């Protein structure tokens, strides 16, 4: 990854790291901070959890929890090393571009799968919206509500979902093309 592509990938990964942290009961800003420190030290061979602790002031248990989470998702990898002054083994954490590219590709495929399911669902169902507050309801929900908005009492109107579906299909097509490009770049022989 070079230039703008790298910056975009790092930003995408940071968003992913924040969401991953939040879903696992970890402070998102702490996980993002650790991720950025590892990213900055990757060209130098990585950074140890002891160094992360001294740089951030975070508790070692929190740091290790974040490292384990990022490692499990193959965002970072570790290598074993020796402490320069002690005889203890240390682990140095770094971002491995090969595994991270595969992780991003896997994530894109999961997003694509969800979008395809949404497109199939949306194309087979009609929706109703409230012209006053903008609330959206499926046909079944609108039927149950007697086609009256429960928030403001306005009569629900059938929504024209063609434009939204077309936008969703363009997004799906673009993501499929991006996945194909990524696969050819990652798996080229």
From Swiss-Prot:
GO molecular function term, any single one: DNA binding
Gene Ontology BP annotations: regulation of DNA-templated transcription; transcription initiation at RNA polymerase II promoter
SUPFAM superfamilies linked: Winged helix' DNA-binding domain, Zinc beta-ribbon
HTH TFE/IIEalpha-type domain location: 9-101
Superkingdom, natural source: Archaea
Keywords: DNA-binding, Transcription, Transcription regulation
Stored InterPro entries: TF_E_archaea, TFE, TFIIE/TFIIEa_HTH, TFIIE_asu, TFIIEa/SarR/Rpc3_HTH_dom, WH-like_DNA-bd_sf, WH_DNA-bd_sf, Znf_TFIIB
Family: Belongs to the TFE family.
PANTHER family: GENERAL TRANSCRIPTION FACTOR IIE SUBUNIT 1, TRANSCRIPTION INITIATION FACTOR IIE, ALPHA SUBUNIT
Subunit-level organization: Monomer. Interaction with RNA polymerase subunits RpoF and RpoE is necessary for Tfe stimulatory transcription activity. Able to interact with Tbp and RNA polymerase in the absence of DNA promoter. Interacts both with the preinitiation and elongation complexes.
Function: Transcription factor that plays a role in the activation of archaeal genes transcribed by RNA polymerase. Facilitates transcription initiation by enhancing TATA-box recognition by TATA-box-binding protein (Tbp), and transcription factor B (Tfb) and RNA polymerase recruitment. Not absolutely required for transcription in vitro, but particularly important in cases where Tbp or Tfb function is not optimal. It dynamically alters the nucleic acid-binding properties of RNA polymerases by stabilizing the initiation complex and destabilizing elongation complexes.
Domains (record comment): The winged helix domain is involved in binding to DNA in the preinitiation complex.
The protein's name in its UniProt record: Transcription factor E
């Amino acid at each position: 990854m070079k230039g703008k592509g790298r910056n975009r990938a790092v930003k995408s990964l940071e968003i992913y790291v924040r969401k991953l942290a939040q879903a696992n009961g970890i402070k998102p800003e702490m996980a993002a901070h650790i991720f950025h420190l590892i990213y900055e030290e990757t060209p130098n061979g990585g950074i140890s959890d002891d160094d992360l602790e001294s740089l951030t002031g975070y508790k070692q248990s929190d740091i290790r929890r974040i490292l384990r989470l990022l490692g499990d998702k193959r965002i970072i990898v570790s290598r074993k090393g020796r402490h320069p002054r002690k005889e203890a083994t240390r682990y140095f954490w770094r971002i491995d571009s090969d595994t991270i590219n595969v992780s991003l590709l896997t994530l894109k495929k999961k997003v694509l799968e969800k979008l395809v399911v949404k497109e199939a669902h949306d194309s087979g169902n009609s929706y109703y919206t409230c012209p006053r507050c903008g609330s959206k309801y499926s046909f079944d929900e609108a039927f149950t509500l007697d086609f009256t908005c429960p928030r403001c009492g306005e009569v629900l109107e059938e929504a024209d979902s063609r434009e939204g579906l077309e936008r969703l299909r363009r997004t799906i097509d673009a993501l499929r093309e991006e996945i194909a490009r990524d696969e050819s770049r990652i798996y080229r022989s």
